[in-house]
């Protein structure tokens, strides 16, 4: 018996105490061991977004901007969260819609919200313009990208200030531009051609026409994008302020579904 206990103590000499974890000794080899405290590799947790949102659409009209995004949060290919908002009101003249990682969008919402509060506390009568918010986001996204720890989002910023409509785009690399119509995600391939087709024929839309166009594109995306959902929000900004409507849905028709084959 004593020999048996002696062999056990020899086997576990230098090992972990009950309930503790084994710590690898600090040797030159441990520099390459991920379990070692000496190992310092790149941050990779942001390279795999968990809950994501798909397309955001934006269109300018005479006197404002309209933005739309569905309310689905996808966990991979699973339609996990079906009632999340991907559009935020930044201030009375600016709104923002985001696709990509929802956790990163929540972080940006918190940061932007605090920025707006800090600005209002000054009490000088000034607030961030849509163009200022767009410019700040380009710097923030590029900064995080340069640190190899990007915010995994593509954003559409819409606003109305000084009698001018503003619609801007920022992606996770800090790439930014302005356009009369914008679409992110799968919408860049399916919805943007539809938006441009209408705007090429009629460059200036009314608010009703812009809203109808966006609703039509949301219906097409629901038909064609497997990560979209028939519940969405539409946000409108005019000189009166920002208004977010929803959840909304569109009427769909699946009568021809039985004719589609080869994609099962």
From Swiss-Prot:
Its main location: cytoplasm. One of its GO terms (cellular component) is cytoplasm. CDD domains: proteasome_beta_type_4. The modification N-acetylmethionine is found at residue 1. It is found in: Cytoplasm; Nucleus. GO terms for biological process: negative regulation of inflammatory response to antigenic stimulus; proteasome-mediated ubiquitin-dependent protein catabolic process. The keyword Protein transport does not apply. Pfam families: Proteasome. It comes from the Eukaryota. Gene3D superfamilies: Glutamine Phosphoribosylpyrophosphate, subunit 1, domain 1 (3.60.20.10). GO terms for molecular function: lipopolysaccharide binding. Residues 1-45 form a propeptide. The modification Phosphotyrosine is found at residue 102. InterPro entries: Ntn_hydrolases_N, Proteasome_beta4, Proteasome_bsu_CS, Proteasome_sua/b, Proteasome_suB-type. Keywords: Acetylation, Cytoplasm, Disease variant, Host-virus interaction, Nucleus, Phosphoprotein, Proteasome. Induction: Up-regulated in fibrolamellar carcinomas. The modification Phosphoserine is found at residue 26. Non-catalytic component of the 20S core proteasome complex involved in the proteolytic degradation of most intracellular proteins. This complex plays numerous essential roles within the cell by associating with different regulatory particles. Associated with two 19S regulatory particles, forms the 26S proteasome and thus participates in the ATP-dependent degradation of ubiquitinated proteins. The 26S proteasome consists of a 20S proteasome core and two 19S regulatory subunits. The 20S proteasome core is a barrel-shaped complex made of 28 subunits that are arranged in four stacked rings. The two outer rings are each formed by seven alpha subunits, and the two inner rings are formed by seven beta subunits. The proteolytic activity is exerted by three beta-subunits PSMB5, PSMB6 and PSMB7. Forms a ternary complex with SMAD1 and OAZ1 before PSMB4 is incorporated into the 20S proteasome. Interacts with PRPF19. (Microbial infection) Interacts with HTLV-1 Tax protein. Belongs to the peptidase T1B family. It is linked to Proteasome-associated autoinflammatory syndrome 3: An autoinflammatory disorder characterized by onset in early infancy and recurrent fever, nodular dermatitis, myositis, panniculitis-induced lipodystrophy, lymphadenopathy, and immune dysregulation. Variable accompanying features may include joint contractures, hepatosplenomegaly, anemia, thrombocytopenia, recurrent infections, autoantibodies, and hypergammaglobulinemia. Some patients may have intracranial calcifications. PRAAS3 inheritance is autosomal recessive or digenic. This is Proteasome subunit beta type-4. It comes from Homo sapiens. The lineage of its organism: Eukaryota, Metazoa, Chordata, Craniata, Vertebrata. The gene is PSMB4.
